[in-house]
């Protein structure tokens, strides 16, 4: 056996203590030393082939035993480095100084599996000799252990000197309810939908509850550590106890039932003093829920707790606060985005700080500084858009914690900390909802189900905004079932007098989202049924790239009609895997322009997908140049967006603009048309330009484009794609997919799930002849499976590029500049009249006359639109800048 005592040199200072894996006592019959070039010593230790984890026998002997010296007492972080071939959670078991073995994550599936670093636990160690025992799992090679003194993050001077403008009241309760609001909450308990939930809560709170202090006996069979055991050894969690304790405290508060209040205090004091958590990702969410629940009981039952119980609860809340990802003091993470913008600060630590404010005001000062001086100003800027930068799953989740913080402050002080724009943001997810109950994809998506639900967030949204439409959305998400499981929060905030409005028909069919996330979502209706005839189209612009779960997809589009037609192909499982950073989050998984420079390098080992550059967070990725919809703002005939996207790409592009125009045709079998017009110039003509669209099924190539059919088995939708530019003589169309769907210019990445996206198809249009500048004009007709193609033609002039489809005409500037001079417009004779949209016009007054000289009317082109809409008979016209006093105003 190896001898740890002989091989480890005692540290002369507690700054860093390194323990090589192969330097301990181990059983040669079970373990072997393996060469690993990436490891610190070039070697590691692993179980021999055929050996299984055997910890569950009482007489089990550790696989490896280490002995080491600590020259000075301190609190240490204990880290491990390990490797595996399996992209799954891998667990070791560890015991420090004879304590009960604890199961800890040693490899996380999204990290570098060849050398994965994990924080196993914290350890308070005295000066002198210490021991660590390790039980290894299969297929894991241990590199080393390392002890580092726990780093306490400093408090910025501005936070240390901060005097909050809003402080908790001296009276109790003060958390989620105050003396001023207590009576209204009590009166609302037996009104409307609250009554049943209140009666059920009281019944549950009346039952005694025994804390589960013992770990259940482990199964007798051998268990592979790749999957966690039913109860992780050495980890004590009992979330049911928290639920019961808070319900007892709530009944105490509502009915002055002191007996239940004392029961709640005892449950929390007993639990929090024993609670211990593992090291798996996001464990801070469980820790935080314990802190929050403890804070509620501490505040609501304050007069019923003994001095010793108060001390225990306060001390352990502060102990657990150190294990939060954001740390304590809470400055380890930024709060505008990421895990720092979740419950840990906005609910958990904030609630703790309010509950203990009378005894210690420092925690509240630090939490309120980060929220009121950092999070609120930053998100007030973001909320102007009405869109959330973290997309369809993480967006509502993180936004919900903003609203939670807003509720906590409002209930405590009567003051609203966010601007009124906060109330706009929930409508982003309403507009993203597609008829089958899912949503258009945006960012990393983990939501599933027939009707994607985020009822917790929808509840906070409608209660804070007092909005009947948002309450209707909560009901659609099976919200009342959620309410039964979250009875205390529901009864605290739900106003039974607010009646849910189920229909969304009074909402405009197009919604524009402004800077910093400029974009537009267009709908043809508000029905939610898989066989609905409603289409949903997203035209994504640009503004700011925030990073994290946001994708590199500025300028992308999506189309839904009886199934996804223009789809995102990325799937999200784990953050930062090779597939995630090379395909899922990258431009190639989206419907946008790719420009391939074979010499382009992307950061952090990412491959070249020809797409947008990996920007640092909060960088500009383009800007909206023009936008408009109308003429009826409720049911617009056209929706137009123009965006400058050059900033989203590297310097391989010298300029790039994309114009979108969605035409709502109002036809049963052809609800609409999406037109994209791209003008881009590269610094070198040989850089290949690709107009890309993704689909779940293989497209059928046609003479002028291709047809995509949705995978919906009954009444599928189809997308008839016509490429008008490049011209046919200079145009190639290719498609690839199935097993090659996730291949990025020769490099294949394995998708994490067997969903339609994993075997989708990527179709590209590109010019045959290399040129510095190219134009792409593409018309996409949305239709049911039996509808014939609509007639499409070009009617170009020297000034503009014109598309006619069905009874619509859309004109774009032929040049990069806006149109400032008179131009001719030919309206074909195939129909009696057309709805005409002229884009890219100079701001100001314009007039339209027949070519024969008869004047028709004047119109004003708005500076943020650059458009002129008119209904014209077939014929020839002249559109001129300037006002003709003899003509009527449009």
What label would you give each PLM region?
Residues 49-52, 62-66, 116-120, 627-628, ...:
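Short structured motifs
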Residues 62, 88-90, 119, 128, ...:
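Residues that flank catalytic or metal-binding motifs in active/ligand-binding sites
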Residues 148-217, 228, 253, 298, ...:
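Acidic/polar, glycine-enriched structural segments that form the non-catalytic walls/loops
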Residues 480-712, 770-785:
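Catalytic and substrate-binding regions of extracellular carbohydrate-active enzymes
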């Amino acid at each position: 056996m190896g001898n740890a005592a002989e091989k480890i040199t005692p540290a002369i200072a507690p700054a860093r203590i390194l323990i090589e894996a192969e330097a301990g006592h181990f059983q040669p019959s079970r373990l072997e030393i393996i060469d690993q070039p990436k490891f610190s010593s070039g070697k590691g230790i692993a179980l021999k082939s055929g050996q299984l984890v055997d910890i569950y026998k009482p007489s089990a002997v550790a696989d490896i035993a280490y002995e080491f010296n600590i020259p000075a007492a301190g609190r240490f972080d204990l880290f491990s480095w390990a490797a595996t071939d399996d992209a799954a959670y891998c667990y070791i078991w560890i015991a420090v100084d004879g304590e009960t073995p604890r199961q800890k994550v040693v490899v996380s599936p999204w990290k570098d599996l060849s050398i994965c670093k994990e924080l196993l636990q914290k350890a308070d160690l005295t000066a002198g000799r210490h021991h660590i025992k390790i039980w290894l799992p299969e297929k894991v090679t241990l590199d080393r252990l390392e002890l580092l003194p726990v780093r306490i993050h400093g408090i910025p001077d501005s936070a240390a000197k901060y005097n909050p403008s809003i402080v908790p009241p001296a009276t109790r309760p003060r958390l989620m309810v105050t003396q001023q609001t207590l009576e209204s909450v009590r009166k609302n308990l037996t009104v409307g939908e609250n009554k049943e939930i209140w009666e059920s809560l009281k019944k549950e709170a009346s039952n005694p509850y025994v804390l589960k202090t013992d770990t259940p006996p482990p199964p007798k069979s051998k268990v592979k550590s790749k999957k966690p055991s039913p109860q992780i050894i050495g980890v004590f969690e009992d979330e049911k106890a928290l639920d019961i304790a808070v319900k007892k405290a709530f009944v105490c508060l509502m009915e002055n039932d002191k007996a239940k209040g004392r029961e709640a205090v005892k449950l929390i004091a007993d639990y929090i003093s024993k609670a211990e958590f593992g090291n798996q990702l996001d464990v801070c969410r469980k820790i935080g829920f314990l802190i929050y629940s403890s804070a509620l009981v501490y505040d609501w039952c304050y007069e019923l707790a003994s001095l010793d119980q108060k001390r225990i609860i306060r001390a352990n809340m502060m102990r657990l606060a150190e294990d939060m990802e954001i740390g304590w003091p809470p400055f380890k993470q930024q709060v505008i985005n990421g895990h720092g913008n979740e419950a840990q600060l906005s609910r958990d630590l904030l609630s703790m700080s309010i509950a203990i404010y009378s005894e210690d005001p420092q925690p509240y000062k630090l939490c309120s500084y980060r929220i009121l001086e950092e999070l609120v100003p930053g998100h007030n800027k973001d909320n102007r858009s009405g869109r959330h930068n973290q997309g369809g799953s993480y967006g509502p989740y993180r936004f919900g914690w903003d609203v939670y913080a807003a509720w906590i402050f409002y209930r405590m002080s009567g003051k609203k900390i966010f601007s009124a724009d906060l109330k706009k943001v929930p409508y982003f997810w309403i507009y993203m909802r597609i008829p089958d109950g899912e949503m258009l994809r945006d960012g990393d998506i983990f939501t599933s189900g027939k009707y994607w639900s985020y009822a917790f967030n929808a509840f906070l949204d409608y209660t804070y905004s007092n909005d009947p439409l948002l309450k209707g959305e909560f009901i659609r998400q099976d919200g009342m079932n959620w309410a039964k499981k979250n009875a205390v929060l529901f009864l605290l905030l739900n106003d039974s007098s607010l009646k849910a409005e189920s229909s969304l028909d009074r909402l405009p069919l197009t919604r524009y989202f402004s800077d910093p996330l400029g974009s537009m979502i267009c709908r043809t209706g508000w029905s939610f049924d898989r066989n609905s005839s409603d289409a949903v189209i997203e035209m994504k612009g640009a503004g700011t790239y925030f990073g994290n779960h946001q994708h590199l997809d500025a300028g992308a589009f999506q189309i839904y009609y009886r199934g996804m037609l223009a789809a995102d192909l990325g799937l999200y499982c784990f953050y930062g895997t090779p597939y995630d950073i090379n395909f899922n989050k990258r431009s190639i998984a989206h419907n946008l322009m790719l420009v391939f420079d074979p010499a382009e390098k992307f950061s952090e080992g990412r491959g070249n997908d020809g797409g947008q550059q990996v920007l640092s967070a909060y960088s500009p990725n383009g800007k909206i140049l023009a936008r408009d919809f109308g003429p009826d703002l409720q049911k617009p005939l056209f929706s137009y967006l123009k965006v400058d996207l050059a900033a989203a790409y590297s310097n391989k592009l010298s300029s790039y603009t994309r114009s979108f125009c969605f035409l709502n045709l109002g036809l049963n079998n052809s609800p609409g048309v999406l037109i994209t017009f791209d003008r881009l110039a590269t610094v070198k003509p040989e850089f290949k330009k690709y107009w890309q669209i993704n689909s779940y099924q293989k497209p059928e190539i046609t003479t002028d484009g291709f047809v995509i059919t949705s995978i919906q088995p009954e009444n599928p939708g189809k997308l008839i794609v016509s490429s008008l530019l490049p011209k046919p003589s200079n145009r190639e169309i290719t498609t690839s997919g199935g097993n090659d769907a996730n291949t990025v210019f020769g490099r294949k990445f394995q998708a994490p799930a067997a969903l339609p996206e994993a075997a989708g198809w990527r179709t590209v249009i590109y010019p045959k002849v290399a040129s510095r500048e190219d134009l792409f004009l593409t018309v996409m007709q949305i239709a049911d499976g039996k509808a014939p193609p609509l007639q499409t033609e070009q009617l170009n002039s020297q000034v503009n590029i014109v598309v006619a489809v069905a009874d619509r005409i859309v004109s774009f500037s032929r040049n990069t500049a806006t149109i400032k001079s008179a131009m001719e417009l030919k309206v074909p004779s195939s129909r009696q009249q057309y709805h005409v949209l002229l884009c890219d016009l100079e701001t100001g007054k314009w007039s339209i006359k027949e070519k024969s000289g008869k004047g028709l009317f004047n119109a004003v082109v708005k500076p943020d639109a650059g458009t002129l809409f008119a209904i014209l008979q077939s014929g020839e016209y002249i559109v001129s800048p300037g006002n003709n006093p003899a003509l009527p105003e449009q």
